Amino acid sequence: MSATAIPAATLASGEGIAERASSLDWDRVSRDLDTTGNAMVERLLSPDECRSLASMYPADDVFRSRIVMARHGFGRGEYKYFSYPLPEIIAGLRTALYPHLAPIANRWNEALGSDARYPAEHADFIARCHEAGQRKPTPLLLQYQADDYNCLHQDVYGEHVFPIQVAILLSEPGRDFTGGEFVMTEQRPRMQSRAEVVPLRQGDAVVFTVSNRPVQGTRGVYRVNLRHGVSRIRSGHRHTVGIIFHDAL
């Protein structure tokens, strides 16, 4: 099915996504990110929007590349990177979510002793990426079936890395698939790693750490290292859209 065959009414406009983003409880998102490295946002997308995005997967004209995970040791399953120009809803999510996350990212960098600061608007950050040669769009659509999984990893694509990203589940657990939980691990200095499962439903988003975040300890701030992945799909099909704010080399 080609992307042009999807009724436009089933996908929100950039303005609609911006209104949704503005209405979120960003204070809670910030607290959750500081506490656990992730924050869940319920019903960011409607069921119709989820189905429409998932139905784009066979449409090669909206993607720049397809990755079969087993060929690279990434796990099992596959995903496709969207090409520029991004579908309006994907571009809208990037543009609308970034300004709320940039202050958190800047606060984290300051706590970690990094001089890097992120501009207030996503277009300015992307311009910085493109000037450094990171010109390939990174938003992606992932597809899994029974026995597929995604190994724990970090989505780092070049020198310029925005430290927070978003994944949105497009399928409904129990109805469309079983298994396939979103999993994060946090590696802490001189301690065993901590694992967490985020219980997403269709349309829910998880806002989470790309790689490093600061944690306040008894002797000051220390750095923890996070990875994310997806546990084995036991049955059915699972689609997810990933919103990464930096571009790739």
Where are these regions (language model features)?
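Fe(II)/2-oxoglutarate
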Residues: 1-35
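Non-heme Fe(II)/2-oxoglutarate
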Residues: 28-126
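A short glycine-rich, His/Asp/Glu-containing loop-to-beta-strand
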Residues: 39, 134-146
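Generic detector of contiguous secondary-structure segments
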Residues: 84-95, 127, 146-148, 162-163, ...
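A structural signal for short, well-ordered beta-strand segments
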Residues: 140-141, 166-168, 241-245
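Short, conserved beta-strand element in jelly-roll/cupin
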Residues: 143-146, 158-176
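Histidine-centered catalytic micro-motifs
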Residues: 150-157
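Catalytic core of Fe(II)/2-oxoglutarate
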Residues: 162, 173, 177-249
